Amino acid sequence: MDKFWWRAAWGLCLVQLSLAQIDLNITCRFEGIYHVEKNGRYSISRTEAADLCKAFNSTLPTMAQMEKALSIGFETCRYGFIEGHVVIPRIHPNSICAANNTGVYILTSNTSQYDTYCFNASAPPGEDCTSVTDLPNAFDGPITITIVNRDGTRYVKKGEYRTNPEDINPSSPTDDDVSSGSSSERSSTLGGYIFYNHFSTSPPIPDEDGPWITDSTDRTPATRDQGAFDPSGGSHTTHGSESAGHSHGSREGGANTTSGPLRTPQIPEWLIILASLLALALILAVCIAVNSRRRCGQKKKLVINNGNGAVEDRKSSGLNGEASKSQEMVHLVNKESSETPDQFMTADETRNLQNVDMKIGV
């Protein structure tokens, strides 16, 4: 039992260590815009997104800045926060990215957790893939923050960047998701590193029918092994020459704008480990109780004999091959008279003759 509790304490320590580490995957900068993914899944709230960009000496980008980055090849397959919206920049249509739409795809339901996009005003123009080696505005803290660049290089720093207590100790679990993409690149996360496959980009093709806007809540299935999908909620995209805050792009095949499957909550890892330990403890307790009952619950046989009769021990076999159960036996031996019927007849005749003699004498 002591060994069990030692293992349980060790497991809880490992859970706490895993919660005290943050991995930040960063893409190249396109006109100062870049994508940041935390711990390989959608796990950044809107308040944390602003704090994270601030830690990188950046800000949340505006829609105009996103459109400018899109025009030079910035493309991902991940939802992320910008100023006032949750978007995906798309150049090439893909059924599992932005519901097969192109342009800056806007998700109208933005109450959950996503990735974030940041804008660094001091970044060089065009595409910049220089490795990020610092988190300049982070303050002191116990968290181990690891910055993973596109080329696999890492920068590790102890500190903290979150200012909202709910972001530090979230009350609701985050959702696991697929890996992120980057501008003009499709990426996949493996062991904390990001591998990129470049492909050529082309500017958006305008639609001959002019501006349009669609709205729909239809849902299309998506597979996790192919790329990111659209979280729950209706979404929309715009096309053509619209005002600031809408996207410019093309739509392929006239397909309706759709959103992906519902985001299902995931049980935290520490809760799974704790439940497993409790279940193991319960199983061990039941086994110990059953074993103790088998040892202490055996019955002994009681034999009462007056010494004149023979006692035959009987054993009853249990069902299904179980051990035979002891029986409590009380054997009573009655002593029978040893006189024979002839002896009884002789005694009666003697008494009768005595009575006759007495009568004759009288």
UniProtKB/Swiss-Prot annotation:
Top-down, what is the taxonomic lineage of the species of origin?
Answer: Eukaryota, Metazoa, Chordata, Craniata, Vertebrata
Q: Cite the GO molecular-function annotations of the record.
A: cytokine receptor activity; hyaluronic acid binding
Q: Regarding domains, what does the record say? A: The lectin-like LINK domain is responsible for hyaluronan binding.
Query: Which source organism does the UniProt entry give?
Result: Papio hamadryas (Hamadryas baboon)
One Pfam family here: Xlink
Q: Where is this region: Required for interaction with EZR, MSN and RDX and for co-localization to microvilli?
A: 293-311
Identification of the protein by name: CD44 antigen
Residues that span the membrane, as ranges: 270-290
Oligomeric state and partners? Interacts with PKN2. Interacts with TIAM1 and TIAM2. Interacts with HA, as well as other glycosaminoglycans, collagen, laminin, and fibronectin via its N-terminal segment. Interacts with UNC119. Interacts with PDPN (via extracellular domain); this interaction is required for PDPN-mediated directional migration and regulation of lamellipodia extension/stabilization during cell spreading and migration. Interacts with RDX, EZR and MSN. Interacts with EGFR. Interacts with CD74; this complex is essential for the MIF-induced signaling cascade that results in B cell survival.
Q: How is it modified after translation?
A: Phosphorylated; activation of PKC results in the dephosphorylation of Ser-326 (constitutive phosphorylation site), and the phosphorylation of Ser-292. N-glycosylated.
Q: Which residues are glycosylated?
A: N25, N57, N100, N110, N120, S180, N256
